[in-house]
Amino acid sequence: MKTPPKPALPHEFPGAVWYGDEEIEAAQRVLRRQSPFRYYGPECGLEVARFETEFGRFLASPPGMPWPDDSGLYVTAVNSGSGALEVALDALGVGCGDEVLVQGFMWISSIAAIVRNRAIPVLVDSDDTLNMDAKAIRARVTARTKVIMPVPMLGGVARMGAIMTEVRSINAERLSRGLPPIKVLEDCAQALGAHARGVPGSLAPAADEGVHRVGAFGDAAIFSLQINKNISAGEGGMIVTRDAELHRRIEALHNAGYAKDADAPRNWYGDAPLGWGHGRRMSELQGAVARVQLRRLDGILANMRHSHERFEDHVRRLGMTPRQHADTTHPGDTGYYCIFQLPPGPKDEKGKIIRGRAVAAALNAFALHPWFLHDFEVHVYYNIEPLVAKLPVGNGCPWRCPRNAFHSAYSYARGALPKLDEALVTHVGINVPSRLTREQEDDIISALDYVFKTVIQE
């Protein structure tokens, strides 16, 4: 078979490749004001505060519908997605003696934020969406469970309706036994704009049954604005909640640790000490650029979803199986990454790994930015060396803390999550750039054809 030419493709950074005159003007607007800091300066507080409001309105909007005037959501902008996770967990009261349930296919920050808050991560196996399996949650819950953290990985949504139904059932039982309810923190760093079907609320329904944006289901959610994300300010993060008191804590802890309870607080950072602040404030430069990017988001998602659908359809025609959608009648994935299961091949694990690496190498020759998921660096629990080795944050915490002695029951080596482990050695994925032309999509399809016929079928 003749080798197709290597395609010339746009960069895979979904939001950043759309930077243009509007983002430049937004940044210059802040510089002309000489007010890059949110809370004081000659003309401060104009960008990040507005971005928070607009972000909440977007999240509250049904897909394809206008943004409502009142979102019913509280939003705090921070300087990174990792910082958003750390602040949110701190605000939820996570610390020594607590467990946080999290899936094994995520980004290292999901684990790091738990460990840095001195709690113990507890891994939950995945279903065919490669996200948290609702049916696997109950067996991992203990009296120490404080938070459950689903991660819509690479823009592919989990079965959030089933997860929230399970959490409400567990919480009803806990309350009957005098135990505090478990909170749900959605780590939506890679999934801004995705949506899922179900009923939000971890204790009682917080909205009607239906299709909701991810981030609207749990007690809190975080998002990232890093360069690989659907919109980007270079770095940045968002924390969202419906709970006014939780928002008060988030606002305090993302800053200097003081809540702004008075109409005119004594200091710019607040007047009521709640804890130790993280200093995770978003700059006005980030906020200004992010506001422009948010207005572009629907178009970015539409492009990725269109390309992703073409690639998935072709993968099916080749006899391979795309990653399962949580809702086949109303897919809510962002389209950022196209993952597919290789057809039956080697029976032994070594053979599966050799084949997966060969397929990824062949796809890489066409600059498709592929990953054999088993090798997907620190997106996979057993590739996170500090986790497997239980490296401490400082002075032995959290592993040597007497209140965390129960961690000895948990291993993070490969084998802890059998369903996910098997999926990772049989799946390969490619990036879906957000500015592909029809001809570039055709070039990628030709490359998939070639690799299938010369490597996968061999």
Residue ranges with predicted function:
Residues 1-83, 87, 163, 424-425, ...:
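Conserved PLP-binding active-site segment in aminotransferase class I/II-type PLP enzymes
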Residues 190, 258-268, 310-319, 358-427, ...:
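Conserved PLP cofactor-binding pocket of PLP-dependent enzymes
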Residues 326-349, 370-394, 425-439:
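Conserved PLP-binding active-site segment of the aspartate aminotransferase-like
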Residues 250, 351-366, 444-448:
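Short amphipathic alpha-helices in soluble, non-transmembrane regions
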Residues 190-201, 205-212, 217-337:
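Active-site region of PLP-dependent enzymes
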Residues 62-71, 165-182, 198-212, 349-350:
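Intrinsically disordered, low-complexity Ser/Thr- and acidic-rich flexible linkers and loops
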Residues 26-27, 55, 84, 100, ...:
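Generic structural signal for small/hydrophobic residues in well-ordered secondary structure
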Residues 90-198:
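PLP-dependent aminotransferase-like
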